[in-house]
Each structure stands twice: as structure tokens, then as C-alpha cells.
Design a protein with these regions (language model features):
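Function-dense linear segments that define catalytic or interfacial modules
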Residues: 399-400, 405
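Non-catalytic interaction/regulatory segments
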Residues: 1-392, 397, 411-422
Length: 424
């Protein structure tokens, strides 16, 4: 109540001054930040989060928007969450209300499971959540407990123009996950009206972050769970935790570029770097490859789309169509790409697509993008021996190769942590 009163006083003071409401309020110990902004728009949450400090863990977030869109009030709390224990004066009342709800609506949710779930909750979360919402969260948590995965759900709201998106993520930094979700929804033209960030303890496995967003679609209405928009958004949300930061930056830099395409582009760039670096380590270093890709993004998207269509399990490209599209792209490279280095990059990228034999691109719960490739792609004068088989794996902050020189499996992993991107 004291916090709400301070917010009201600040709003009244700004209204009286005649100025737009644009304030940032901080607690004396900086444990709580509140942003007030005069206008709501897709991406406002991501913009505000970029102003938050990185040196303190984000405990909770509460995002609110006025019905007419003329005021945004976002509160962020820092520090480690306090557990909700039986010593709290409201503990028994909260548990009893949840037990009563479960008895009527979710009989499989037992007394012991409910009490164990409360024991894993933070105090802020347990005191503010309704039994209905807690039951939904518990079901999502059950899907994830003991894993490092992600669950995504969409629900209808009482207001027919709104939908609720719930994302549960195991062992992800709360701040980075909320920011990635906010940015992803903004890229899709989805406006966040309200949002909540909480987490529950997952025992020895770590913790599970819960992000709930009450949203409005690009057309100003609710989101149809059977629509192509939701299919794309859901796929992006499931993969957000595992995407490399370069993939995210690339995907959000171009309106026409989807995150799956961006992931393919960064993966292929890292793959061909292993071949091109033997030709010229300066002309084909990772930074320059990224620059050349961005300068020819339409061509890069076309190559990524060829990769997608070739391995689409529902309708894979026939060899004749694949060969025709490859020939068209090679002609496009000759006619439209100016720099010789850039032509080399995109021709080798097409060779890489052709060398891929299998991929896990379309597996929904994958942790990284992997490919089985023709080993001859990586043979050079310095590496004349052609292996029996090669697997390439591209993920968040890593690339990996599994190389077999015979048709026999041997154990062993070598992990190298480079000092910087150029050494990488």
C-alpha cells in the first residue's frame, strides 16, 4: 500500500505540472525501481529493461499499462527472493484456499504436492497469485522439473481483445529471460499490457523462472492459438534460452528475418569459417563474415530458406527443385554481389548447405542446432585426410565438432574456452 501511495503521489505531481508522466523512482537502497512512461507501444518493456543495472539479480517484475495506453508503470525488484514458509501469518489461509480450489477443479493435485509447491515459492509470488493461476503454473512446472527445458502456453483472458502468454524456463537468468521475451514479442508486433516475473525452487536441479504476459496482437485483438503468428511466436519463445546472442542480434536487426533463419545463418557462418580461415584468416574472420552477411542479408536469408525447405519433414524439397534453386542462387551471387570475398563466402555457404546430410532443425525441444555433414567440406591442403563422419553443433556461446575417422565410436571430449571472439 505504501508503494502504491508513493506512485499515486508521483503521478498527481506530474499531472499538476502539466508535463508528460516520465519518471524513474528508486528505493533508497536501490532494491526497487519503478518506471512511469506516458505512452504504451510494442517494445516499451524491452526499452525500459535496457536501463536496469546488471550488477544485481532481478527478483521480480510487475508490468502495468493504463486501459487507454496513456500510462505505463513498471516495477522491478532486486535481490534474492524470500521463501514462503509456514511461519508467515497468511500461509495457512493461502494453502487452504488453494486446497479448496484443487479439490473442486484439479483433484489430481494432492495435498502434499500443493504444500511442497508452496515450499518452493517465493513470498512475493505466493502472496499475490490466485489458486487458478497457481494451478496452471504448477502444471507447467511439472513438465520442466529436473530438466533444462522451456514450456510455453497461451490462455484466453476475460477481455476478448487480450491473451495471456506464460513462459516457464529452467535455470535461466531471470533478467535476461524477461528481456529476451519482451524483445521477441515486440519484434512480432505484440504489445505487453501487463507482465509478471517470478521463480520457483526446483531443488537440486536449480530453479524455474515464470514469466506471464497479458498481451494484445498486432491487429489490436487477442492471439488465435491456431494462427501462423502464434506458431512462429511459440517456436521463438521455446528456443530463446538456447539462442546465441549473435543470432538474437542478427534476427532483431532486420524486419524480414526470422529467428530460425538467423540461427541457420550464424551456424553456417561459423561452419564455413572453419574452411575459409585456412585460406585467409584475416579476410574471413568471424567479425568480417558477419559484416558481409549483413551487407547481403536478402541473399543470406534465401540460402537459409533453402536449408529450411530442403529438410522440412512435412514437405522436403525434391532434388530437382533443390538443384534449380541452388543454381539460381549461384547466378544471383555472380550478378549481384560486388566483393570477391563476399562471393566466396556465399558460394561456400551454398556448398555447406549441400554438404548437410541431416539436421535437428525441426525438433521442437532441441538445445542447439546440429548437422551431420559431408566430411569432404572441411578437407584442405592442411587437412588432407577425409574423416569417416563429421557432426557440427552450433549453440549459445559455443560451436562443436564430433569427428570420426573410422566407423567406430570412441569416447572423449575436448572443450576449449577462447579468450575472445577472434580467437574463437
Amino acid at each position: 500500500e505504501q508503494t502504491q501511495l508513493s506512485h499515486l503521489r508521483a503521478i498527481i505531481a506530474e499531472k499538476a505540472s502539466g508535463r508528460p508522466i516520465e519518471l524513474t523512482l528508486k528505493a533508497e537502497d536501490s532494491s526497487e525501481w519503478t518506471f512511469m512512461r506516458p505512452r504504451d507501444y510494442p517494445g516499451v518493456l524491452a526499452d525500459l529493461m535496457s536501463e536496469l543495472p546488471w550488477d544485481r539479480p532481478l527478483r521480480a517484475a510487475k508490468i502495468h499499462t493504463a486501459e487507454d495506453g496513456t500510462l505505463v508503470l513498471d516495477t522491478f525488484e532486486f535481490g534474492e527472493p524470500l521463501p514462503f514458509t509456514s511461519n508467515h501469518p497468511q500461509y495457512e489461509a493461502k494453502v487452504e484456499r488453494t486446497l479448496a480450489y484443487a479439490n473442486e477443479n484439479l483433484p489430481d493435485w494432492t495435498d502434499s504436492q500443493i504444500r511442497n509447491y508452496f515450499a518452493s515459492c517465493s513470498e512475493d509470488y505466493a502472496l499475490t497469485i490466485t489458486p487458478f493461476r497457481m494451478a496452471n503454473h504448477w502444471q507447467l512446472v511439472q513438465e520442466l522439473t529436473g530438466t533444462d527445458g522451456t514450456s510455453v502456453a497461451i490462455e484466453a483472458e476475460d477481455d476478448p481483445n487480450l491473451s495471456r502468454i506464460i513462459v516457464a524456463v529452467s535455470n535461466s537468468t531471470r533478467r535476461s529471460m524477461l528481456q529476451r521475451i519482451a524483445t521477441s514479442l515486440s519484434k512480432s508486433g505484440i504489445n505487453i499490457h501487463r507482465a509478471y516475473l517470478d521463480s520457483v525452487d526446483d531443488g537440486a536441479n536449480g530453479w524455474i523462472t515464470l514469466v506471464g504476459c497479458v498481451v494484445q496482437g498486432p491487429d489490436g485483438g487477442s492471439i488465435d492459438e491456431n494462427s501462423p503468428l502464434w506458431k512462429e511466436v511459440r517456436g521463438d519463445l521455446l528456443r530463446l534460452k538456447w539462442l546465441d546472442q549473435r543470432t538474437v542480434r542478427l534476427g532483431y536487426s532486420f524486419k524480414e528475418l526470422t529467428l530460425p533463419c538467423a540461427e541457420i545463418i550464424t551456424a553456417l557462418s561459423d561452419l564455413i569459417n572453419q574452411y575459409l580461415v585456412k585460406k585467409n584468416p584475416y579476410a574471413f574472420n568471424p567479425t568480417r563474415l558477419d559484416t558481409l552477411v549483413r551487407s547481403n542479408i536478402t541473399l543470406a536469408i534465401s540460402i537459409a530458406s533453402l536449408f529450411q525447405d530442403r529438410f522440412n519433414p512435412r514437405n522436403p524439397l525434391q532434388d530437382s527443385e533443390y538443384n534449380a534453386r541452388t543454381a539460381e542462387l549461384k547466378e544471383l551471387i555472380v550478378n549481384t554481389v560486388d566483393l570477391e570475398d563476399a562471393r566466396t563466402v556465399f558460394n561456400v555457404m551454398l556448398d555447406a548447405v549441400d554438404a548437410v546430410k541431416r539436421t535437428n532443425l525441426f525438433i521442437e525441444d532441441r538445445y542447439a542446432l546440429s548437422m551431420r555433414i559431408d566430411p569432404s567440406l572441411l578437407t584442405t591442403d592442411d587437412r588432407p585426410e577425409c574423416p569417416f563422419g563429421v557432426f557440427f553443433v552450433h549453440g549459445r556461446d559455443f560451436n562443436g565438432f564430433h569427428v570420426r575417422f573410422r566407423d567406430i565410436s570412441r569416447g572423449g571430449v575436448r572443450a576449449i574456452h577462447p579468450k575472445g571472439i577472434e580467437q574463437f
